[in-house]
Regions:
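Extracellular/periplasmic periplasmic-binding protein-like sensory domains
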Residues: 246-326, 392-396, 407-418
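Solvent-exposed, acidic/polar segments of extracytosolic/periplasmic ligand-binding ectodomains
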Residues: 279, 352-419
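N-terminal export signals
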Residues: 7-26
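Beta-alpha junction/loop-to-helix N-cap segments that form part of ligand/metal-binding clefts
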Residues: 48-54, 69-139, 208-215, 240
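Short, polar/charged alpha-helical segment
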Residues: 46-70, 190-194
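Extracytoplasmic "Venus flytrap"
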Residues: 37-57, 79-86, 108-109, 177-186, ...
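C-terminal segment of N-terminal export signals and the immediately downstream linker at the start
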Residues: 22-40
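Extracytoplasmic ligand/sensor domains, especially the bilobed periplasmic-binding protein
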Residues: 101-205, 256-283
Length: 419
């Protein structure tokens, strides 16, 4: 049966439990599985995030091989949300009331997560947030924990690194281009706050429909405003269209810094398709293979991920989403073991008080469930060639400019970086 919201056909990734290792007793082997539930964008415009499923699966398989959580195996219950918020409340109601899952992962991103947060708070459920921005700012749910490294005060500060670069380059005038969508609007609003804080002049603040493919008129407005920097808040389809338009039309000679909050240039398919159109762009990321970021945990994960990605035809690199989806599982397991319970209140209380070591590093959560330390990367694309995905597996193509502690190279002004 196809995966649709209407049928709620369960994606068969966890129904068959991993065989119990020999060290399990028969009582343990017969224990009821602990169910972790979520929706995932397996189809639709956000389907690149389905690579995160591999992160969940690796975590589940390794955990079950080691004895599970509290002596019980872990099962994943995942539904396709088709990249649409419309069916997500019904999916999560089903996960809670019909599937009786023990703990939840959110959908991907701010747009899809926003529609369930009131229900999650009302039902008092524990949930791991998967890359949304500011989803807990209004709800203030004490059992929400964000796996992305946005840091505290994420609504404004998650992209602060972009503006720190602007400040270092003596930027004076900034323009904002933002899609009319939850994530992009939140990012733009955060950018406005920092622009005001840093004393920059906001010369253009333009919102456009997320379906926009022709950016010629917007780029004409941009050139007329003559900004020194352009802060872009976009999702994959409009990120692609905008960068192609920039290559064809340009942004004007005044622009030294371009990018910031573009979702899309983290994914292998867009990197390969856009190629040299990316040069000079400075944009957020969570992991790139620069020497300042390499670690044994990430290296091992990516080596294991590569053949699976090739077999399934998913994101070839797996840098952005998959390691953090694995880490989300690690956080849940550590909290349940630390609390010695599946009681959601106890798990939440434990996480607010204790750090968790994961393949993406040590994570400590604040009162809002965000990381206590911002670890968002601002990377600049430099010397990128066309149609060569392997170049992104090596250092030097996505150079870390910010934060300073992880810097791996020097910033190059936009026009110069584009040759």
């Amino acid at each position: 049966m196809p995966l649709t919201r209407r049928s709620f056909s369960k994606f068969a990734i966890g129904a068959a439990l991993v065989p119990a290792p020999a060290i399990w007793t028969s009582a343990r082997a017969q224990a009821q599985p602990i169910k972790l539930g979520c929706s995932l964008s397996l189809t639709g415009p956000l389907s690149s995030v389905k690579a995160g499923l591999v992160g969940y699966e690796f975590w589940r398989d390794d955990l079950n091989a080691a004895g599970g959580i509290l002596g019980r195996p872990v099962e994943l219950v995942v539904y396709d949300d088709q990249s649409s918020a419309a069916g997500i409340p019904a999916i999560y109601s089903k996960l809670i009331d019909v599937d009786k899952v023990d703990l939840l992962f959110s959908p991907y991103g701010a747009n899809l997560t926003a529609v369930i947060m009131p229900m999650i708070k009302q039902r008092n459920k524990f949930i791991m947030g998967m890359f949304g921005i500011s989803n807990n700012d209004e709800v203030k749910h004490d059992k929400f924990f964000q796996i992305a490294p946005w840091g505290p005060k994420a609504s404004s500060d998650w992209c602060r690194g972009f503006f720190d670069i602007a400040k270092a380059q003596s930027i004076k005038k900034i323009a904002i281009l933002a899609a009319d969508a939850e994530f992009s609007k939140a990012a733009a609003a955060g950018g406005e706050k920092i622009i005001k804080e840093y004393g920059f002049e906001l010369v253009l603040n333009q919102t456009y429909p997320p379906s926009t493919q022709d950016f010629s008129g917007i780029l004409r407005n941009l050139k007329a405003a003559a900004p020194d920097a352009v802060f872009v808040c976009s999702y994959p389809p409009d990120s692609t269209a905008l960068l192609r338009s920039v290559t064809e039309i340009g942004v004007g000679d005044s622009v030294k810094l371009f990018g910031g909050a573009m979702v899309g240039p983290q994914y292998a398919s867009l990197l390969e398709n856009l190629g040299s159109s990316l040069n000079g762009v400075v944009n957020f990321h969570t992991y790139v293979p620069e020497p300042t970021l390499r670690s044994a945990g990430i290296e091992k994960f990516l080596a294991r991920y590569a053949p699976v990605a090739k077999e399934r035809g998913i994101d070839a690199l797996g840098h952005y989403i998959p390691p953090f989806y694995h880490a989300a599982g690690e956080v849940v397991a550590a909290a349940a073991k630390g609390a010695n319970s599946l009681d959601e209140t106890k798990i939440g209380e434990w996480l607010h008080k204790n750090p968790v070591d994961t393949i993406v590093g040590r994570i400590t959560f604040d009162a809002m469930g965000d990381w206590t330390e911002r670890r968002v990367l601002m990377v600049q694309f430099q010397g990128v060639a066309n149609r060569n995905i392997d170049q992104f597996r090596t250092a030097g193509k996505q150079v870390v400019i910010d934060p300073p502690a992880l810097k791996s190279g020097d910033f190059i002004p936009f026009a110069k970086a584009r040759g």
